[in-house]
Amino acid sequence: MGISGLLPALSPVTKAIHVKDYANKRVAIDGYSWLHKGAYSCSQEIVLGIPTRNYINYFISRIKMLISYKVIPVVIFDGGPLPNKKLKEQERLRHREEYKNKAKAYLLEGNKSQANICFQKAVDITPRMAFLLIKELRALKVEYLVAPYEADAQLTYLSITGQVDAIITEDSDLVAFGATHIIFKMDKYGYAQEIKTEDLGSCKKDGYDFIDFNQTMLRQMCILSGCDYLPSLSGMGLKTSFKLLKQHRDIEKVFKYLKREKSNFSQEYEQQFYKADFTFKHQRVFDPVSRILTTLLPLPTIIDSRFLNDNNNNTNDGDSNGDGSSGGSGSGGGFLDFIGPVIDDEIAEKIALGIIDPETHEQFDKTQPYPKNTFTPQPKKLLSPISFNTKEFKNQTNNNNNNNNNIKSNNGTNNKNGMILNEGKLVQKGRNLNDQFTFASNKITQYMTTTTTTTTTTTTTKNNNNNQKQQPMIEDDTGYDFQIDSFEIDDCLNDDDDDESIILSNNLNNQENVLESDCEFDDDDDQRGIDVDDSEKKDSFVLDSDYEDEKEEEEVKSSTFNSSSSISSGNSSKIKKTLVSSKFFVSSESSVLESDDDDGGDDDDDSFNHNQNFSSSGNNIQPNSNIFHNGELSSYGYQKNQKNFKNVNSNSSSNSSNSSNSSSGNSNSGNRIFNSGNSSNKNNTNGGIVKSTLLSSNDRVSLNFFDQFQFDGKKKQSILVSQSRKSFSSPTLSNNEDYDSSFVSSTIPSSIGDDYDQMNSCSNNNNFNYNNSSNFNNNNINNSNNNRNSGFSGFLKRKSSSQTAAPTTPTTPTTPKTSSSSSSTLTNSTITTEHSSYILKKPKYQATSNSPISTLDSSQNYNDQSFISKKAHSFSSLDSDLIFKEDDVDNLIFNNNNNNNNNNNNNNNNNNNNNNNNNNNNNNNNNNNNNNNNNNNNNNNNNDNNNKITTPSNKSFNSIVLTTTSATTSITQQDNEIYTTPKKKLPSTPISSSSNDIISKYFSSPSKVGPKSEGAPPTPVNLEGMSLRSVLSLRYQQTMASSPTK
């Protein structure tokens, strides 16, 4: 009973409900489906003719359950046999007889279990059984109707005319008929499953996709797969019929295909198919409002001769009203008998009231008075034809009620308002997201045509401000639709509520996690003033390496930037994938290049939104008053104050840097050099957006995101920001406001990745330069431009060999060589090589301010190149050595405004082992800015030394503290020379442990490097009082020294 496999195919649009959702609503019930269920418990009695009331009790219990939830039940019973279903009924009758005989045989053998199964299959619900139930319903004053023929068509008619709000059944044929709301599998507690026909367009599962289907295609698919009116062809199931209709979109084309491919396809099958389709649309039903016999959908005025009997070709007999109703004429004369013989309206009404047998037309009980009314008519919904636009597949409703007379048959042309079965020519059309399937409950005449109403699913698109053209949509191999836009905003965007906030919001199509910000953009491009460059759209692309698998929810990683003149954005929507989109924003004066890499909604603290730290005024971005956090100056505010402490040689070095970089950074090479200090760089006069094309690995400068790369030998372009930039970064790059974000996060080992959650990405300082004015007397050390392998790439190359190499000869400025950690010294020069930084993807967990991020185990090894986590890298498929080798060789930038100052050791570092405030045996050595006073207080009981470093600023903030657990090396400074002295093991408990010994491999040798100053012993510096950035800075300058002193 029903369409095999249809309900599982529609499971994506099946909703679990409870009948209380239909409280105070009218719900029709397929009476025979509940009678069959009730008969299972007493199948033996029913088959053998033993009187029983079990099936009635079952039915009444369900009715009372609905009433208890204030649902108004309307029971519909089957009527007489339908001629078009004659073969099916004969087959069922034969099967029931077979199972009846089997059940009796099992019963004689004593096999009651098998006998009970056979009895259940042999049960036949008769009109007499229905009449016994009707009498109970009358007593309960429950509404009911008996259909003239099939209850399915009667239920559908009540649904589409607004007499009931939903249908409870177990027969999937209701979907093919076109009922609007169908409830399946209801249990005795009222829980059930609901399918709405209007939702079928979004059904997509296991090869089924009904997005561009209509009601006609759905009905014909069900008929091809096999239904009660027509068996299917051999090998023709639901999925095969779906594919044929999906491909050809017209039943005539399907038949032409079947004639070529199927040997068992015949002309007789084709004719029976059209009869079945006609029966689904025009089966005879009873109208409870007008109390006449009518058809489910109005009959066409001209009927195809194939539907008429040879004995009678009168096309208007029995249809005097022109709407399918009989008009009281009982002479059917064989006219369309397969949809149900025409009967008098008086007989049809008696059948509907349950007075006479629908098969024999005999009265059930002559002693019973006639019921006056068993159904409460409801206002009919207006009937209006629906035409189908083959180009757009959109809703088009025609309110003209007289269009029924304009429907043509299949003998000629199509009517402009609709097309009937054999003349419906659907235009071949590809998938369109706007083509959604729906069915309006008040539009019943859609069954006359091959059309249906459709809802529209709109996708977020960007319109060109000039011609309002929709931007191109590209679909990748994973099936996700992306809209690749490249915008240039001519006008500065201001928010009405917060003029100090500018943020880019990623709009998702259907989605769950949207990055919340203080300032949101309106989707109207006219107000945003967005102009799209077609040349930029062609070169827009998304990296495969920018995707990261997510298990539970879809997220969006986005990089948001402050801007007052130019903004670039990109939107994406995907499932169980995370797209990292990195764009660059620039203000013409501030020149801060920033990038945040968020993990998709797991950061809710205020430090994440960097907008709060800026105030926008014209083209200037200035720090806001709320840059102070927890009583201390944030990293951004602190470093902004450092511009008052610029080195004396800053301007001269900056000029030399600009001149050297301007010659090498021409517009055709693809390089965009970022200098600080002056803005005299030729490529950086406007601070605007320029386009850069990758030519080779030696001709590019990589930013925080690798903006230039090649795919399949093709050039790709991206937007780079040419600007003068200062060496401070926004505090939003770290969730810890006290952390000095000028530290390059790419140097964090993967072994301490668990403690590295609060750093969203690298600090965006492309300079691996630690010019500390406080520790080294503000001496800017200059190195020649020939030091090609200095910088982070050379640092990586040298550190790998420093683990095992013995002390070697001093390095030269032009070709640095690998040397051990004990043989390198600092000369009076500073290496200012700028390196390409890269994006570290934040771990999937959230650290707190008390987490081990504030401490670092000295057992970790900085010399191990494995700390560059391939998973953390945004280009996970590339090797880390290759990345830095290609990026760092030719990109040397002299940056003289690096305010990477070592900060005061704060008392808030509670995890500091050996708290020196409570240990009077420790020797405290304070180095001021001039490094002239070195106070050494040696204690015989303890050799531990604590070095506190003061910066030029009186402001202090938290820095990362190193907690050593092994024999630690102290660093002292005397006349700008570094010495290393052995230390005893500190009695401290490590916060974190790792197999890599970081400090011991950098400062593993107890030997001193360089001569002592005259008249003063070396002053040891304890690593315990230094930040991680300071330690790495010292070690970096050691390894980069051109000539060690022994």
UniProtKB/Swiss-Prot annotation:
Cofactor binding note of this UniProt entry: Binds 2 magnesium ions per subunit. They probably participate in the reaction catalyzed by the enzyme. May bind an additional third magnesium ion after substrate binding.
Pfam families: XPG_I, XPG_N
Any one biological process term the GO annotation gives: regulation of protein localization to chromatin
Binding site for Mg(2+) 2: D171, D173, D228
Residue ranges, compositional bias (Acidic residues): 545-555, 594-606
Keyword Lipid biosynthesis included in the entry's annotation: no
Predominant localisation class: nucleus
UniProt-annotated location(s): Nucleus
Biased composition (Low complexity): 395-416, 453-467, 558-572, 609-620, 647-685, 773-793, 801-833, 895-947
Keyword Membrane attributed: no
Molecular function, one GO term: metal ion binding
Cofactors required: Mg(2+)
Keywords: DNA damage, DNA excision, DNA repair, DNA-binding, Endonuclease, Excision nuclease, Exonuclease, Hydrolase, Magnesium, Metal-binding, Nuclease, Nucleus
Compositionally biased region (Polar residues): 621-646, 723-736
A GO cellular-component term linked to this record: nucleus
Alphabetical list of PANTHER family matching this protein: DNA DAMAGE-INDUCIBLE PROTEIN DIN7-RELATED, FLAP ENDONUCLEASE FAMILY MEMBER
Oligomer status and interactors: Interacts with the mlh1-pms2 heterodimer via mlh1. Interacts with msh3. Interacts with the msh2-msh6 heterodimer via msh2, and this interaction may increase the processivity of the 5'->3' exonuclease activity.
Family: Belongs to the XPG/RAD2 endonuclease family. EXO1 subfamily.
Function: 5'->3' double-stranded DNA exonuclease which may also possess a cryptic 3'->5' double-stranded DNA exonuclease activity. Functions in DNA mismatch repair (MMR) to excise mismatch-containing DNA tracts directed by strand breaks located either 5' or 3' to the mismatch. Also exhibits endonuclease activity against 5'-overhanging flap structures similar to those generated by displacement synthesis when DNA polymerase encounters the 5'-end of a downstream Okazaki fragment.
Name of the protein in its database record: Exonuclease 1
